[in-house]
């Protein structure tokens, strides 16, 4: 298994129990969507899977190793094999898009090469190619502060694709995009995962997108796994219970009409 959790609890420093009793296995090459209401623990779970947060109890295995039994150096080497796509990518405002994308390889480069890349981007064609897949090739030398929220999200995705990881974890990666663009972007991510055998786990508020693109759906509520089902087995009853007391989101928040057509699942 690429990712395995057994009896996992995670308690934040303020004492809040964010995850409790998680049992979960995800195989290499699986595409999994995590859905659930706000505050359910989706982002915390992704940070746990990225080895950015340690569990408070239980056993965590990532790519065949227990990350918190490794040295800091070994754990950093493990993280090179994992890409975490943030809902709001932490990109310096004055950084150029080409540099932001090439930062996907910083974990592999030494200090000297990394500093040189800040002055003279080392792989402009590579950055251009991955940006072109996301319809951003014309933004190659634009500063990040000039981009919209949806464009910044696509730059974060481009950086993850350029990194070429074995595991890709995406936290609300299309929340700032209109429905058509969100659908296209998720289709691209899923197709990349299929072609390269990448394990893809994404948290999504837009349930319709999750069901359209991911074969496996995990519902999380109150820090626990509420259900773990094939997409075809997820019923309205499952969703009503998962999102009790919260309005169900079927598409990203946008000014674009929600009736925009959806393309087939990847």
Feature locations, PLM:
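Conserved ABC ATPase signature
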Residues: 143-147, 151
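Catalytic Walker B motif of ABC-type/P-loop ATPase nucleotide-binding domains
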Residues: 168-171
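H-loop/switch region of ABC-family ATPase nucleotide-binding domains
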Residues: 204-205
């Amino acid at each position: 298994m690429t990712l395995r959790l057994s009896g996992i609890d995670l308690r934040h420093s303020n004492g809040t129990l964010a995850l409790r009793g998680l049992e979960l296995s995800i195989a290499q090459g699986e595409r999994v969507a995590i859905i659930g209401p706000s505050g359910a623990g989706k982002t915390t779970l992704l940070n746990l899977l990225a080895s950015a947060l340690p569990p408070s109890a239980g056993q965590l295995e990532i790519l065949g190793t227990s990350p918190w039994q490794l040295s800091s150096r070994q754990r950093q080497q493990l993280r090179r094999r994992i890409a975490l796509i943030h809902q709001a990518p932490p990109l310096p405002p004055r950084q150029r898009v080409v540099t932001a994308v090439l930062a996907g390889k910083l974990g592999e480069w030494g200090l000297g090469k990394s500093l040189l890349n800040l002055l003279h981007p080392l792989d402009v064609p590579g950055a251009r190619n991955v940006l072109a897949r996301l319809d951003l090739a014309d933004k190659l030398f634009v500063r990040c502060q000039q981009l919209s929220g949806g464009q910044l999200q696509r730059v974060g995705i481009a950086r993850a694709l350029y990194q070429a990881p074995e595991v890709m974890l995406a936290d609300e990666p299309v929340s700032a995009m209109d429905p058509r663009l969100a659908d296209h972007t998720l289709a691209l991510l899923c197709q990349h995962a299929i072609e390269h055998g990448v394990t893809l786990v994404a948290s999504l508020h837009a349930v319709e997108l999750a069901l359209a693109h991911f074969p496996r759906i995990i519902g999380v509520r109150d820090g626990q796994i509420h259900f773990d089902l094939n997409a075809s087995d997820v019923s309205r009853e499952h969703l009503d219970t998962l999102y009790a007391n919260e309005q169900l989101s079927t598409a990203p928040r946008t000014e674009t009409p929600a009736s925009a057509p959806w393309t087939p699942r990847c």
